[in-house]
Swiss-Prot record:
Family: Belongs to the succinate/malate CoA ligase beta subunit family.
Annotated residues for binding of Mg(2+): N207, D221
Domain ATP-grasp: start-end pairs: 9-252
Name listed for the protein in its UniProt record: Succinate--CoA ligase [ADP-forming] subunit beta
Signal peptide interval: none
Sorted UniProt keywords: ATP-binding, Ligase, Magnesium, Metal-binding, Nucleotide-binding, Tricarboxylic acid cycle
PANTHER family attached to this UniProt entry: SUCCINATE--COA LIGASE [GDP-FORMING] SUBUNIT BETA, MITOCHONDRIAL, SUCCINYL-COA SYNTHETASE BETA CHAIN
UniProt pathway: Carbohydrate metabolism; tricarboxylic acid cycle; succinate from succinyl-CoA (ligase route): step 1/1
Organism of this sequence: Rhodopirellula baltica (strain DSM 10527 / NCIMB 13988 / SH1)
């Protein structure tokens, strides 16, 4: 689950991670008032969307309007908010369609001596969280990892213990931090690692992390993703969910008990099993197609779920065809075939439909489909299915 920057900073503050004062607003007049509340000096107006790269992003109809604006008066704060609110902001992470800005964060400015990067993720290979820091703050970390990976420094830590002092000292030495700033870095990094564990995060990223002129380490950003599977332990965090920032199709799928992620391609996939679903997307790509989604109906899929799955897939305007790839195990092929027939009657298929069935009761399932009036293209294996759906949507 993602949250906005201003929400992340509220949580940071409660966890002892230093942040600057700021106010979330939804109108230009509120932005001007927020600027005055912050003391009437330098402030920053930031678009609040669930995507990074806002500082280099721009509004679709106004390329000069960036997603992060430095302001020096209430009038400038109001103008910046007017240029963002209700507009679509395009960043490196939103895609060309952009995301609508419905709120902005007006934050106090500060004396910046250095800009750094800090991020924490789970290293699945190492089975531990890993703290990553870099001297290249304010730059997309993906770019740093590709062009200058030697400037990213890592320290794994035990979630039951946290980050040790010697690890902080190692990182400070590599970052060139000493004196008062090193003491601030110890408090900051250890607090961030505790925050990551206590809140069941999948990722916590600050870019930029700054050292002020008086040696204090402060978070100028907050990008946080929580583990959805741990939300039962954090009922209060559910209140931070902004449904307007999430794909409607993904919300529908979640409600129906389906695992669905929307992608940018035009070949929709309906598969049972996460591993098989990923393999299906890979082989579509291998044969020249572009998958439109990840969709795992699970082992216990019923007719209602399959019907809703087709409604979701066919509601995508980019969908030019559907590949159904089922390996019958817990979910028998006859069950899926029956669900397909029911779905065709309720939804109607107006795009090519390629079906590959294998596993338990496969012959009976194929017979059911053959005797029905569902217009399908049969495939005998996954390669055959991928080739046929790519050809049908070309």
């Amino acid at each position: 689950m993602k949250i906005h920057e201003y929400q992340g900073k509220q949580l940071f503050r409660t966890a002892g991670v230093p942040v600057l004062d700021g106010h979330m607003v939804t109108t230009p007049d509120e932005a001007a008032a927020a600027y005055d509340k912050l003391g009437g000096k330098i402030a920053v107006v930031k678009a609040q969307i669930h995507a990074g790269g806002r500082g280099k992003g721009n509004v679709i109809d106004n390329p000069d309007q960036k997603g992060v604006v430095l302001v020096k008066s209430a009038e400038e704060a109001k103008a910046a908010a007017e240029g963002l609110l209700g507009k679509k902001l395009v960043t490196i992470q939103t895609g060309p369609e952009g995301q609508t800005v419905s709120k902005v964060f007006v934050e106090a400015g500060c004396d910046i001596a250095r800009e750094l990067y800090l991020g924490i993720v789970v290293d699945r290979a190492g089975s531990k969280p890993v703290l990553m820091v870099s001297t290249e703050g304010g730059v997309e970390i993906e770019t740093v990892a590709e062009e200058t990976p030697e400037l990213i420094f890592k320290e794994h830590f035990d979630p039951a213990v946290g980050l040790d002092g010697f690890q902080v000292r190692k990182l400070c030495k590599k970052l060139g931090i000493e004196g008062a700033a090193a003491k601030s870095a110890y408090k900051f990094m250890t607090a961030m690692c505790r925050f990551f564990v206590d809140f069941d995060c999948e990722m916590a990223e600050i870019n930029p992390l700054v050292i002020t002129g008086d040696g204090e380490m402060v978070a100028l950003d907050a990008k946080i993703i929580f583990d959805e599977n741990a939300m039962f332990r954090h009922k209060d965090l559910e209140e931070l969910r902004d449904l307007s920032e999430e794909e409607e199709s993904e919300l529908r799928a979640k409600k129906a008990g389906l695992s669905y992620v929307k992608l940018d391609g035009n070949i929709a996939c309906l598969v049972n099993g996460a591993g098989l679903a990923m393999s299906t997307m890979d082989i579509i790509k291998y044969h020249g197609g572009e998958p439109a989604n990840f969709l795992d109906v699970g082992g216990g899929a019923n007719a209602a779920q399959v019907t809703e799955a087709f409604r979701i897939l066919l509601s995508d305007p980019n969908c030019k065809g559907v590949l159904v790839n089922i390996f019958g195990g817990i979910a028998r092929c006859t069950t899926i075939a029956g669900a397909l027939i029911t779905a065709s009657k309720e939804v109607g298929f107006n795009v090519p439909l390629v079906v590959r069935l294998e596993g338990t009761e496969v012959e009976e399932g194929r017979k059911m489909l053959a005797e029905s009036d569902v217009d399908i293209i049969n495939a005998m294996d996954l390669t055959d299915a991928a080739k046929k759906i790519v050809a049908a949507t070309a």
